[in-house]
């Protein structure tokens, strides 16, 4: 299936944008066309099921996805992000449809889902499994009416070369995109360590992939340079989904509380439109911390 080029859509708009006086690194980052957003930023609030991983993963589970959706509804959210890890093994369409109906009845969108793939693997059965996993979750996302799936690029295996791993990751994403387009699903590549640990590494992949149903899943806690907020600003124009962490860690320093107001300002400056998904990972129990952080985010995006 031929995917129309985002560059085709944005060529005229990109040509009309004046280049401000910005650092060389930022100019290089903007060499590929960002998503063409000119309207004021429009932000909606969602919560990732991963925030409750301790309850969803416990043996036996202290929460299931239906109960997670109930919690999100009690919080007055716009949507929920249903992480793939917490679905039943070999989940069937009937379960997905019941979960979608449950969220709909409570006034919630399913803002997205996510899959833990590794496209850096060389050709062979292990790589085929990863490609099939993403394809399965494209199907599942379509059943859920989830518009976006968070995907990973992967990691460089011991003895492998980063350039080769990057090439394989690019090929894996390109191979998956046409099927995702057929199902009406966008693939969002996260900055998640490995070959996407830095803005430059992530942009190397993004620059190589030109499709309207592809973008960045911007995780605000996953850049660890000297100025993570500046790094986020470089990638925000390419974001199709945003996962907000309540902590950041700078190069050579430990964790510190994230400046959520600054994070939201970065998104607004980029005219980001879409879901802001709280993905809580800090030490305080989610039951007590998540409501407080949602209240803060709601006040910032309203």
Regions found by a protein language model. Name each.
Residues 108, 185, 270-274:
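A short helix->loop->beta-strand "cap" motif at the edges of active sites that frequently abuts
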């Amino acid at each position: 299936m031929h995917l129309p080029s985002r560059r085709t859509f944005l060529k005229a708009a990109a040509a009309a944008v004046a280049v401000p006086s910005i650092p060389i690194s930022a100019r290089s980052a903007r060499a590929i066309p960002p998503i063409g957003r000119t309207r004021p930023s429009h932000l909606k609030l969602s919560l990732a099921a991963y925030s409750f991983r301790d309850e969803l993963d416990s043996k036996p589970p202290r929460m299931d996805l239906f109960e997670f959706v109930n919690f999100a509804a009690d919080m007055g959210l716009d949507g929920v992000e249903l992480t793939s890890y917490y679905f039943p093994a070999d989940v069937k369409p009937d379960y997905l449809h019941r979960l979608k109906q449950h969220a709909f009845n409570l006034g919630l969108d399913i803002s997205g889902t996510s899959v833990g793939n590794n496209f850096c693997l060389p050709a062979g059965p292990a790589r085929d499994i990863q490609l099939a996993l993403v394809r399965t979750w494209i199907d599942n996302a379509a059943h859920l009416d989830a518009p976006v799936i968070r995907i990973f690029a992967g990691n460089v295996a011991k003895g492998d070369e980063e350039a080769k791993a990057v090439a394989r990751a690019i090929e894996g994403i390109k191979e998956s995109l046409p099927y995702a387009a057929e199902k009406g699903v966008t693939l969002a590549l996260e900055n998640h360590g490995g070959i996407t640990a830095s803005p430059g590494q992530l942009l190397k992949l993004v620059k190589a992939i030109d499709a309207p149903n592809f973008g960045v899943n911007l995780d605000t806690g996953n850049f660890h340079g000297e100025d993570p907020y500046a790094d986020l600003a470089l990638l925000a124009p390419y974001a199709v989904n945003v996962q907000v962490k309540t902590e950041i860690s700078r190069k050579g320093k430990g964790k510190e509380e994230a400046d959520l107001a600054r994070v939201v300002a970065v998104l607004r400056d980029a005219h980001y439109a879409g879901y802001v998904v709280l993905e809580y990972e800090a030490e305080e129990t989610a039951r007590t911390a998540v409501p407080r952080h949602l209240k803060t985010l709601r006040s910032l995006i309203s």
